Amino acid sequence: MEEFKVYFEKDGSRQQYFLYPLLFQEYIYALAHNHVLNGLIFYESSENFVYDNKFSLIIVKRLITQMYQQNSLSNLVNDSNRNRLVRQNKNFYYQTILEGFSVIMEIPFSIIFLSSVEEKKAKIPKIQNLRSIHATFPFLEDKLSHLNHVSDILIPYPIHLEILVQVLQGWIQDVPSLHLLRFFLHEFHNWNSLITPKKSISFLFSKGNQRLFLFLYNSYVFECESALVFLRKQSFYLRSTSFGTFVERTHFYGKIEHIVVVRRKNFQKALSLFKDPFIHYIRYKGKSILASKGTHFLMKKWKYHLLNFWQCHFDFWSQPHRIHINQLSNHSFYFMGYLSSVRINFSTVRSQMLESSFLMDTPTKKFDTIVPIIPLIGSLAKAKFCNVSGHPVSKPVWADLSDADIIDRFGRICRNLSHYHSGSSKKQSLYRVKYILRLSCARTLARKHKSTVRAFFKRLGSEFLEEFFTDKEQVLSLIFPSLRSPSHRVHKGERIWYLDIIRINDLVNNS
Protein backbone atom coordinates (compact mmCIF):
# COMPACT_ATOMS: atom_id res chain seq x y z
CA MET A 1 0.00 0.00 0.00
CA GLU A 2 2.90 2.39 0.65
CA GLU A 3 4.04 1.78 -2.93
CA PHE A 4 0.60 2.78 -4.19
CA LYS A 5 0.65 5.95 -2.08
CA VAL A 6 3.98 7.01 -3.58
CA TYR A 7 2.64 6.18 -7.02
CA PHE A 8 -0.38 8.46 -6.61
CA GLU A 9 1.52 11.24 -4.83
CA LYS A 10 3.82 11.85 -7.80
CA ASP A 11 1.26 14.24 -9.21
CA GLY A 12 -1.49 14.98 -6.75
CA SER A 13 -3.54 17.02 -9.21
CA ARG A 14 -3.79 14.09 -11.65
CA GLN A 15 -3.68 11.10 -9.32
CA GLN A 16 -7.00 9.72 -10.62
CA TYR A 17 -5.69 9.38 -14.20
CA PHE A 18 -3.07 6.69 -13.54
CA LEU A 19 -5.20 3.56 -13.03
CA TYR A 20 -5.02 2.02 -16.49
CA PRO A 21 -1.17 1.62 -16.59
CA LEU A 22 -1.37 -0.46 -13.40
CA LEU A 23 -3.20 -3.11 -15.40
CA PHE A 24 0.12 -4.05 -17.01
CA GLN A 25 2.01 -4.58 -13.74
CA GLU A 26 2.68 -8.18 -12.73
CA TYR A 27 2.31 -7.65 -8.97
CA ILE A 28 -1.32 -6.55 -9.46
CA TYR A 29 -2.20 -10.11 -10.49
CA ALA A 30 -0.30 -11.55 -7.55
CA LEU A 31 -2.49 -9.40 -5.28
CA ALA A 32 -5.61 -10.49 -7.15
CA HIS A 33 -4.83 -14.20 -6.86
CA ASN A 34 -3.87 -14.04 -3.20
CA HIS A 35 -6.80 -11.78 -2.25
CA VAL A 36 -4.49 -9.64 -0.14
CA LEU A 37 -4.42 -5.86 -0.09
CA ASN A 38 -2.98 -5.10 3.35
CA GLY A 39 -6.08 -6.59 4.98
CA LEU A 40 -8.55 -4.29 3.21
CA ILE A 41 -10.65 -7.06 1.71
CA PHE A 42 -13.45 -7.62 4.21
CA TYR A 43 -15.23 -10.57 2.61
CA GLU A 44 -13.91 -14.10 2.71
CA SER A 45 -12.57 -15.64 -0.48
CA SER A 46 -14.41 -18.75 -1.64
CA GLU A 47 -11.34 -20.44 -3.01
CA ASN A 48 -7.65 -20.43 -2.17
CA PHE A 49 -6.18 -19.28 -5.46
CA VAL A 50 -2.57 -20.03 -6.26
CA TYR A 51 -0.59 -17.50 -8.27
CA ASP A 52 1.52 -19.55 -10.66
CA ASN A 53 1.40 -17.51 -13.90
CA LYS A 54 3.50 -14.54 -14.94
CA PHE A 55 1.64 -11.52 -16.30
CA SER A 56 3.85 -9.01 -18.09
CA LEU A 57 2.89 -5.95 -20.12
CA ILE A 58 3.07 -7.92 -23.39
CA ILE A 59 0.89 -10.78 -22.11
CA VAL A 60 -1.81 -8.47 -20.74
CA LYS A 61 -1.89 -6.39 -23.92
CA ARG A 62 -2.21 -9.60 -25.93
CA LEU A 63 -5.11 -10.77 -23.76
CA ILE A 64 -6.97 -7.46 -24.10
CA THR A 65 -6.46 -7.51 -27.87
CA GLN A 66 -7.69 -11.11 -28.10
CA MET A 67 -10.76 -10.21 -26.03
CA TYR A 68 -11.83 -7.64 -28.62
CA GLN A 69 -10.92 -9.97 -31.50
CA GLN A 70 -12.95 -12.82 -30.00
CA ASN A 71 -15.86 -10.44 -29.55
CA SER A 72 -15.83 -9.62 -33.28
CA LEU A 73 -15.22 -13.24 -34.28
CA SER A 74 -18.24 -14.50 -32.34
CA ASN A 75 -20.51 -12.44 -34.58
CA LEU A 76 -19.06 -13.99 -37.75
CA VAL A 77 -18.74 -17.67 -36.86
CA ASN A 78 -21.82 -19.87 -37.27
CA ASP A 79 -20.37 -23.23 -36.30
CA SER A 80 -21.74 -24.23 -32.87
CA ASN A 81 -18.59 -26.08 -31.76
CA ARG A 82 -16.38 -23.17 -32.68
CA ASN A 83 -18.75 -20.76 -30.97
CA ARG A 84 -18.46 -22.83 -27.80
CA LEU A 85 -14.67 -22.67 -28.01
CA VAL A 86 -14.80 -18.91 -28.58
CA ARG A 87 -17.01 -18.44 -25.50
CA GLN A 88 -14.68 -20.53 -23.35
CA ASN A 89 -11.66 -18.49 -24.45
CA LYS A 90 -13.53 -15.25 -23.86
CA ASN A 91 -14.45 -16.29 -20.32
CA PHE A 92 -10.83 -17.14 -19.59
CA TYR A 93 -9.60 -13.79 -20.89
CA TYR A 94 -12.30 -11.88 -19.02
CA GLN A 95 -11.64 -13.69 -15.77
CA THR A 96 -7.88 -13.16 -15.99
CA ILE A 97 -8.07 -9.43 -16.64
CA LEU A 98 -11.04 -8.97 -14.31
CA GLU A 99 -9.10 -10.19 -11.28
CA GLY A 100 -6.39 -7.60 -11.78
CA PHE A 101 -8.88 -4.91 -12.75
CA SER A 102 -10.80 -5.44 -9.49
CA VAL A 103 -7.69 -4.70 -7.43
CA ILE A 104 -6.89 -1.59 -9.47
CA MET A 105 -10.38 -0.12 -9.01
CA GLU A 106 -10.12 -0.54 -5.24
CA ILE A 107 -6.74 1.16 -4.83
CA PRO A 108 -7.82 4.84 -4.63
CA PHE A 109 -10.70 4.03 -2.29
CA SER A 110 -8.52 1.76 -0.15
CA ILE A 111 -5.99 4.54 0.41
CA ILE A 112 -8.74 6.98 1.43
CA PHE A 113 -10.36 4.39 3.69
CA LEU A 114 -7.09 3.46 5.37
CA SER A 115 -6.30 7.08 6.19
CA SER A 116 -9.81 7.66 7.59
CA VAL A 117 -9.58 4.54 9.77
CA GLU A 118 -6.25 5.70 11.20
CA GLU A 119 -7.81 9.05 12.09
CA LYS A 120 -10.80 7.39 13.76
CA LYS A 121 -8.58 5.06 15.76
CA ALA A 122 -6.97 8.08 17.39
CA LYS A 123 -10.37 9.52 18.32
CA ILE A 124 -12.38 6.38 19.11
CA PRO A 125 -10.80 3.65 21.28
CA LYS A 126 -11.62 0.04 20.42
CA ILE A 127 -12.96 1.02 17.00
CA GLN A 128 -12.98 -2.67 16.01
CA ASN A 129 -16.15 -3.10 18.09
CA LEU A 130 -17.96 -0.79 15.67
CA ARG A 131 -17.62 -3.50 13.01
CA SER A 132 -20.04 -5.67 14.94
CA ILE A 133 -23.51 -6.00 13.47
CA HIS A 134 -24.93 -6.04 16.99
CA ALA A 135 -23.51 -2.55 17.60
CA THR A 136 -26.52 -1.26 15.64
CA PHE A 137 -29.12 -2.52 18.10
CA PRO A 138 -27.98 -0.65 21.25
CA PHE A 139 -28.16 2.49 19.12
CA LEU A 140 -31.73 1.63 18.06
CA GLU A 141 -32.62 0.75 21.63
CA ASP A 142 -31.39 4.12 22.83
CA LYS A 143 -32.84 6.31 20.06
CA LEU A 144 -36.03 4.78 18.67
CA SER A 145 -37.97 4.95 21.92
CA HIS A 146 -37.92 8.76 21.59
CA LEU A 147 -39.04 8.86 17.94
CA ASN A 148 -42.46 8.75 16.30
CA HIS A 149 -42.19 7.53 12.71
CA VAL A 150 -40.02 5.11 10.76
CA SER A 151 -39.53 4.61 7.03
CA ASP A 152 -38.56 1.23 5.60
CA ILE A 153 -36.41 1.98 2.57
CA LEU A 154 -35.24 -0.51 -0.03
CA ILE A 155 -32.37 0.66 -2.22
CA PRO A 156 -33.85 1.14 -5.73
CA TYR A 157 -33.21 -1.47 -8.41
CA PRO A 158 -32.87 -2.76 -11.13
CA ILE A 159 -29.51 -1.17 -11.85
CA HIS A 160 -28.72 -0.40 -15.47
CA LEU A 161 -25.16 -1.14 -16.51
CA GLU A 162 -24.46 2.40 -17.59
CA ILE A 163 -25.47 3.70 -14.15
CA LEU A 164 -22.71 1.66 -12.53
CA VAL A 165 -20.16 3.23 -14.87
CA GLN A 166 -21.55 6.73 -14.36
CA VAL A 167 -21.33 6.36 -10.60
CA LEU A 168 -17.57 5.80 -10.85
CA GLN A 169 -17.05 8.67 -13.27
CA GLY A 170 -17.33 11.11 -10.41
CA TRP A 171 -14.49 9.34 -8.59
CA ILE A 172 -12.29 7.96 -11.36
CA GLN A 173 -11.76 10.02 -14.50
CA ASP A 174 -9.47 7.51 -16.17
CA VAL A 175 -11.29 7.09 -19.50
CA PRO A 176 -9.54 3.84 -20.63
CA SER A 177 -10.37 2.16 -17.31
CA LEU A 178 -14.02 3.18 -17.56
CA HIS A 179 -14.22 1.91 -21.13
CA LEU A 180 -12.75 -1.42 -20.05
CA LEU A 181 -15.24 -1.61 -17.17
CA ARG A 182 -18.11 -0.94 -19.57
CA PHE A 183 -16.79 -3.69 -21.84
CA PHE A 184 -16.66 -6.19 -18.95
CA LEU A 185 -20.20 -5.44 -17.84
CA HIS A 186 -21.74 -5.74 -21.29
CA GLU A 187 -19.89 -8.90 -22.29
CA PHE A 188 -20.18 -11.00 -19.14
CA HIS A 189 -22.84 -13.69 -19.62
CA ASN A 190 -26.31 -12.23 -18.99
CA TRP A 191 -25.13 -8.71 -18.13
CA ASN A 192 -26.39 -7.20 -21.37
CA SER A 193 -29.70 -6.08 -19.85
CA LEU A 194 -30.56 -5.25 -16.25
CA ILE A 195 -29.24 -6.49 -12.93
CA THR A 196 -32.10 -7.90 -10.87
CA PRO A 197 -31.29 -9.17 -7.38
CA LYS A 198 -33.47 -12.27 -7.65
CA LYS A 199 -32.28 -13.71 -10.96
CA SER A 200 -28.70 -12.48 -11.10
CA ILE A 201 -27.69 -12.67 -7.44
CA SER A 202 -25.91 -15.99 -7.92
CA PHE A 203 -23.91 -14.53 -10.78
CA LEU A 204 -23.41 -11.17 -9.07
CA PHE A 205 -21.72 -12.77 -6.06
CA SER A 206 -20.20 -15.78 -7.79
CA LYS A 207 -16.72 -16.87 -6.80
CA GLY A 208 -14.98 -15.27 -9.75
CA ASN A 209 -16.88 -11.99 -9.86
CA GLN A 210 -17.45 -11.34 -6.17
CA ARG A 211 -14.75 -8.76 -5.68
CA LEU A 212 -15.51 -6.34 -8.51
CA PHE A 213 -19.29 -6.43 -8.28
CA LEU A 214 -19.34 -5.97 -4.52
CA PHE A 215 -17.20 -2.91 -5.11
CA LEU A 216 -19.57 -1.63 -7.81
CA TYR A 217 -22.65 -2.30 -5.69
CA ASN A 218 -21.18 -0.51 -2.67
CA SER A 219 -20.28 2.46 -4.87
CA TYR A 220 -23.86 2.56 -6.16
CA VAL A 221 -25.32 2.39 -2.64
CA PHE A 222 -22.96 5.15 -1.52
CA GLU A 223 -24.27 7.31 -4.36
CA CYS A 224 -27.87 6.58 -3.32
CA GLU A 225 -27.11 7.58 0.26
CA SER A 226 -25.51 10.85 -0.84
CA ALA A 227 -29.08 12.13 -1.26
CA LEU A 228 -29.54 11.91 2.51
CA VAL A 229 -26.43 14.01 3.12
CA PHE A 230 -27.59 16.62 0.63
CA LEU A 231 -31.11 16.81 2.06
CA ARG A 232 -29.84 16.85 5.63
CA LYS A 233 -27.55 19.79 4.91
CA GLN A 234 -30.35 21.59 3.12
CA SER A 235 -32.67 21.05 6.09
CA PHE A 236 -29.96 22.26 8.47
CA TYR A 237 -29.37 25.48 6.53
CA LEU A 238 -33.07 26.23 6.26
CA ARG A 239 -33.49 25.92 10.00
CA SER A 240 -30.53 28.22 10.63
CA THR A 241 -31.99 31.12 8.63
CA SER A 242 -35.28 32.99 8.70
CA PHE A 243 -38.16 31.58 6.69
CA GLY A 244 -38.98 34.89 5.00
CA THR A 245 -35.65 34.93 3.23
CA PHE A 246 -36.60 31.92 1.12
CA VAL A 247 -40.12 32.89 0.11
CA GLU A 248 -38.82 33.65 -3.38
CA ARG A 249 -36.97 30.52 -4.57
CA THR A 250 -35.00 31.94 -7.52
CA HIS A 251 -31.26 31.25 -7.21
CA PHE A 252 -32.06 29.09 -4.20
CA TYR A 253 -28.62 27.53 -3.78
CA GLY A 254 -26.84 30.82 -4.30
CA LYS A 255 -28.88 32.35 -1.50
CA ILE A 256 -28.14 29.47 0.82
CA GLU A 257 -24.42 29.72 0.20
CA HIS A 258 -24.38 33.50 0.63
CA ILE A 259 -26.51 33.61 3.77
CA VAL A 260 -24.75 30.74 5.50
CA VAL A 261 -21.33 32.29 4.92
CA VAL A 262 -22.49 35.65 6.26
CA ARG A 263 -24.37 34.34 9.27
CA ARG A 264 -21.82 31.78 10.27
CA LYS A 265 -19.48 34.54 11.43
CA ASN A 266 -21.97 36.13 13.78
CA PHE A 267 -24.19 33.21 14.79
CA GLN A 268 -21.84 30.25 14.89
CA LYS A 269 -23.02 29.18 18.35
CA ALA A 270 -26.67 29.67 17.45
CA LEU A 271 -26.41 27.38 14.43
CA SER A 272 -25.91 24.30 16.57
CA LEU A 273 -29.22 24.95 18.32
CA PHE A 274 -31.14 24.46 15.10
CA LYS A 275 -29.56 21.14 14.26
CA ASP A 276 -32.24 18.47 14.41
CA PRO A 277 -30.89 15.52 16.46
CA PHE A 278 -33.97 13.37 15.91
CA ILE A 279 -33.43 12.01 12.40
CA HIS A 280 -31.48 8.76 12.28
CA TYR A 281 -30.48 6.59 9.33
CA ILE A 282 -29.23 2.98 9.43
CA ARG A 283 -28.57 0.62 6.53
CA TYR A 284 -27.64 -3.04 6.16
CA LYS A 285 -27.13 -4.31 2.61
CA GLY A 286 -30.07 -3.20 0.45
CA LYS A 287 -32.44 -2.19 3.24
CA SER A 288 -32.30 0.93 5.38
CA ILE A 289 -34.26 2.58 8.17
CA LEU A 290 -34.97 6.31 8.44
CA ALA A 291 -36.54 7.32 11.77
CA SER A 292 -37.66 10.75 12.93
CA LYS A 293 -39.42 12.51 15.77
CA GLY A 294 -41.25 14.67 13.26
CA THR A 295 -44.77 14.35 11.95
CA HIS A 296 -46.07 12.06 9.24
CA PHE A 297 -46.10 15.03 6.86
CA LEU A 298 -42.37 15.59 7.44
CA MET A 299 -41.62 11.95 6.63
CA LYS A 300 -43.66 12.24 3.42
CA LYS A 301 -41.54 15.24 2.43
CA TRP A 302 -38.35 13.21 3.02
CA LYS A 303 -39.80 10.41 0.89
CA TYR A 304 -40.73 12.84 -1.88
CA HIS A 305 -37.26 14.43 -1.94
CA LEU A 306 -35.48 11.06 -1.88
CA LEU A 307 -37.52 9.69 -4.77
CA ASN A 308 -37.01 12.82 -6.83
CA PHE A 309 -33.28 12.86 -6.14
CA TRP A 310 -32.88 9.23 -7.19
CA GLN A 311 -35.05 9.69 -10.26
CA CYS A 312 -33.21 12.81 -11.47
CA HIS A 313 -29.73 11.61 -10.52
CA PHE A 314 -29.93 8.09 -11.96
CA ASP A 315 -32.52 8.72 -14.70
CA PHE A 316 -34.79 5.81 -13.80
CA TRP A 317 -38.13 5.25 -12.11
CA SER A 318 -37.37 5.14 -8.40
CA GLN A 319 -40.30 2.91 -7.35
CA PRO A 320 -42.24 4.84 -4.65
CA HIS A 321 -43.73 1.63 -3.25
CA ARG A 322 -40.27 0.71 -1.91
CA ILE A 323 -40.50 3.35 0.84
CA HIS A 324 -43.07 2.70 3.57
CA ILE A 325 -43.83 5.23 6.32
CA ASN A 326 -45.29 3.88 9.56
CA GLN A 327 -45.87 5.00 13.10
CA LEU A 328 -43.53 3.33 15.56
CA SER A 329 -46.15 2.89 18.27
CA ASN A 330 -48.31 0.52 16.17
CA HIS A 331 -45.95 -0.92 13.58
CA SER A 332 -43.17 -3.52 13.59
CA PHE A 333 -40.39 -3.47 11.03
CA TYR A 334 -38.13 -6.33 9.94
CA PHE A 335 -34.45 -5.43 9.96
CA MET A 336 -31.29 -7.55 10.23
CA GLY A 337 -33.09 -10.72 11.28
CA TYR A 338 -35.20 -9.11 14.02
CA LEU A 339 -38.81 -7.95 14.13
CA SER A 340 -38.44 -4.65 15.98
CA SER A 341 -41.01 -2.27 17.41
CA VAL A 342 -41.50 0.35 20.11
CA ARG A 343 -43.82 -0.99 22.79
CA ILE A 344 -45.72 1.29 25.17
CA ASN A 345 -45.92 0.03 28.75
CA PHE A 346 -48.17 1.62 31.35
CA SER A 347 -47.15 1.66 34.98
CA THR A 348 -49.68 2.64 37.62
CA VAL A 349 -48.52 5.18 40.18
CA ARG A 350 -50.51 6.22 43.26
CA SER A 351 -50.28 9.93 43.96
CA GLN A 352 -51.55 11.58 47.13
CA MET A 353 -52.22 15.25 47.67
CA LEU A 354 -53.35 16.25 51.17
CA GLU A 355 -56.24 13.93 51.97
CA SER A 356 -56.94 12.94 48.35
CA SER A 357 -55.23 10.14 46.50
CA PHE A 358 -55.57 9.05 42.91
CA LEU A 359 -53.99 6.64 40.45
CA MET A 360 -52.04 7.69 37.36
CA ASP A 361 -51.04 5.54 34.41
CA THR A 362 -47.57 6.58 33.27
CA PRO A 363 -46.67 5.45 29.73
CA THR A 364 -43.10 4.41 28.99
CA LYS A 365 -41.71 3.44 25.60
CA LYS A 366 -39.44 0.43 25.22
CA PHE A 367 -37.60 -0.89 22.16
CA ASP A 368 -38.72 -4.48 21.62
CA THR A 369 -37.01 -7.14 19.47
CA ILE A 370 -38.35 -10.61 18.75
CA VAL A 371 -37.26 -13.47 16.51
CA PRO A 372 -39.60 -13.78 13.49
CA ILE A 373 -40.43 -17.48 13.39
CA ILE A 374 -42.06 -17.64 9.93
CA PRO A 375 -39.02 -16.36 7.95
CA LEU A 376 -36.70 -18.60 9.98
CA ILE A 377 -38.83 -21.69 9.32
CA GLY A 378 -38.82 -20.75 5.64
CA SER A 379 -35.02 -20.65 5.69
CA LEU A 380 -34.84 -23.99 7.54
CA ALA A 381 -37.21 -25.53 4.99
CA LYS A 382 -35.09 -24.17 2.14
CA ALA A 383 -32.02 -25.73 3.75
CA LYS A 384 -33.90 -29.08 4.07
CA PHE A 385 -34.00 -29.19 7.89
CA CYS A 386 -37.82 -29.21 7.95
CA ASN A 387 -40.81 -28.88 5.65
CA VAL A 388 -42.72 -25.65 5.03
CA SER A 389 -44.93 -26.37 8.06
CA GLY A 390 -41.94 -26.58 10.39
CA HIS A 391 -41.99 -30.37 10.78
CA PRO A 392 -38.37 -31.60 11.23
CA VAL A 393 -36.94 -33.91 8.57
CA SER A 394 -33.62 -35.68 8.18
CA LYS A 395 -30.69 -34.26 6.25
CA PRO A 396 -29.82 -37.05 3.77
CA VAL A 397 -26.73 -35.35 2.33
CA TRP A 398 -25.09 -35.47 5.78
CA ALA A 399 -25.93 -39.12 6.44
CA ASP A 400 -22.55 -40.28 5.12
CA LEU A 401 -20.64 -38.23 7.69
CA SER A 402 -19.51 -39.55 11.04
CA ASP A 403 -21.77 -39.13 14.06
CA ALA A 404 -19.44 -36.53 15.55
CA ASP A 405 -19.44 -34.48 12.34
CA ILE A 406 -23.23 -34.58 12.08
CA ILE A 407 -23.69 -33.44 15.67
CA ASP A 408 -21.00 -30.79 15.24
CA ARG A 409 -22.69 -29.30 12.17
CA PHE A 410 -26.11 -29.13 13.77
CA GLY A 411 -24.62 -27.80 17.00
CA ARG A 412 -22.67 -25.07 15.21
CA ILE A 413 -25.83 -23.83 13.48
CA CYS A 414 -27.70 -23.87 16.78
CA ARG A 415 -25.00 -21.92 18.62
CA ASN A 416 -24.75 -19.42 15.77
CA LEU A 417 -28.47 -18.71 15.88
CA SER A 418 -28.49 -18.51 19.68
CA HIS A 419 -25.55 -16.15 19.64
CA TYR A 420 -27.03 -13.82 17.04
CA HIS A 421 -30.55 -13.79 18.51
CA SER A 422 -29.35 -13.25 22.08
CA GLY A 423 -30.88 -9.77 21.89
CA SER A 424 -34.42 -11.08 21.53
CA SER A 425 -36.78 -10.07 24.32
CA LYS A 426 -38.88 -13.21 23.73
CA LYS A 427 -37.09 -16.52 23.29
CA GLN A 428 -40.06 -18.77 22.45
CA SER A 429 -39.44 -18.60 18.70
CA LEU A 430 -35.76 -19.37 19.19
CA TYR A 431 -36.62 -22.41 21.33
CA ARG A 432 -38.81 -23.73 18.51
CA VAL A 433 -35.95 -23.35 16.01
CA LYS A 434 -33.65 -25.24 18.39
CA TYR A 435 -36.24 -28.00 18.68
CA ILE A 436 -36.44 -28.32 14.88
CA LEU A 437 -32.66 -28.58 14.57
CA ARG A 438 -32.40 -31.03 17.48
CA LEU A 439 -35.04 -33.37 16.04
CA SER A 440 -33.60 -33.02 12.53
CA CYS A 441 -30.22 -34.08 13.91
CA ALA A 442 -31.81 -37.10 15.61
CA ARG A 443 -33.64 -38.08 12.39
CA THR A 444 -30.39 -37.80 10.41
CA LEU A 445 -28.54 -40.04 12.88
CA ALA A 446 -31.44 -42.52 12.92
CA ARG A 447 -31.46 -42.60 9.12
CA LYS A 448 -27.74 -43.30 9.08
CA HIS A 449 -28.03 -46.21 11.55
CA LYS A 450 -31.26 -47.51 9.90
CA SER A 451 -33.25 -47.01 13.07
CA THR A 452 -36.22 -44.95 14.23
CA VAL A 453 -36.10 -41.74 16.21
CA ARG A 454 -38.16 -43.34 19.00
CA ALA A 455 -35.71 -46.24 19.31
CA PHE A 456 -32.80 -43.84 19.09
CA PHE A 457 -34.08 -41.69 21.96
CA LYS A 458 -35.03 -44.77 23.98
CA ARG A 459 -31.51 -46.16 23.68
CA LEU A 460 -29.68 -42.89 24.42
CA GLY A 461 -32.20 -41.26 26.77
CA SER A 462 -34.66 -38.41 26.40
CA GLU A 463 -31.96 -35.87 27.25
CA PHE A 464 -30.04 -36.80 24.11
CA LEU A 465 -28.34 -33.69 22.65
CA GLU A 466 -30.06 -31.45 25.21
CA GLU A 467 -26.87 -30.46 26.97
CA PHE A 468 -25.03 -30.05 23.68
CA PHE A 469 -27.54 -27.63 22.16
CA THR A 470 -27.70 -25.49 25.30
CA ASP A 471 -23.92 -25.25 25.51
CA LYS A 472 -22.68 -21.66 25.55
CA GLU A 473 -19.50 -22.40 23.65
CA GLN A 474 -18.31 -19.47 21.56
CA VAL A 475 -19.09 -19.59 17.86
CA LEU A 476 -16.02 -20.60 15.89
CA SER A 477 -16.63 -18.16 13.05
CA LEU A 478 -16.34 -15.10 15.29
CA ILE A 479 -13.17 -13.07 15.47
CA PHE A 480 -13.27 -10.94 18.61
CA PRO A 481 -13.56 -12.40 22.11
CA SER A 482 -16.90 -12.06 23.83
CA LEU A 483 -17.21 -9.17 26.24
CA ARG A 484 -19.46 -11.08 28.57
CA SER A 485 -17.84 -12.49 31.70
CA PRO A 486 -18.18 -16.23 32.37
CA SER A 487 -19.75 -15.57 35.76
CA HIS A 488 -22.55 -13.48 34.29
CA ARG A 489 -25.93 -15.20 34.48
CA VAL A 490 -28.60 -14.49 31.92
CA HIS A 491 -31.98 -13.67 33.41
CA LYS A 492 -35.22 -14.45 31.64
CA GLY A 493 -36.08 -11.78 29.09
CA GLU A 494 -32.64 -10.17 29.28
CA ARG A 495 -31.23 -8.90 26.02
CA ILE A 496 -27.53 -9.26 25.24
CA TRP A 497 -25.85 -7.47 22.34
CA TYR A 498 -22.46 -8.87 21.42
CA LEU A 499 -19.69 -6.77 19.90
CA ASP A 500 -18.01 -9.68 18.13
CA ILE A 501 -20.52 -10.56 15.39
CA ILE A 502 -19.37 -9.38 11.97
CA ARG A 503 -21.78 -11.33 9.77
CA ILE A 504 -25.33 -12.65 9.87
CA ASN A 505 -25.94 -16.38 9.90
CA ASP A 506 -26.89 -17.67 6.44
CA LEU A 507 -30.26 -18.92 7.72
CA VAL A 508 -31.08 -15.43 9.02
CA ASN A 509 -29.70 -13.79 5.91
CA ASN A 510 -31.93 -15.83 3.60
CA SER A 511 -35.10 -15.26 5.58
Swiss-Prot record:
Listed GO MF terms: RNA binding
Q: Where in the cell is it found?
A: Plastid, Chloroplast
Query: Is Kinase a UniProt keyword of this protein?
Result: no
Name one matching Pfam family. Intron_maturas2
Q: Name one GO cellular component term.
A: chloroplast
Main localization category: plastid
Q: Which UniProt keywords apply?
A: Chloroplast, mRNA processing, Plastid, RNA-binding, tRNA processing
A Gene Ontology BP annotation from the UniProt entry: RNA splicing
- Cross-referenced InterPro entries: Domain_X, Maturase_MatK, Maturase_MatK_N
Q: In terms of domain of life, where is this protein from?
A: Eukaryota
Function (record text) = Usually encoded in the trnK tRNA gene intron. Probably assists in splicing its own and other chloroplast group II introns.
**What family does this belong to?**
Belongs to the intron maturase 2 family. MatK subfamily.
Name of the protein in its database record: Maturase K
Q: Which organism is it from?
A: Acorus calamus var. americanus
Tell me the name of the encoding gene: matK
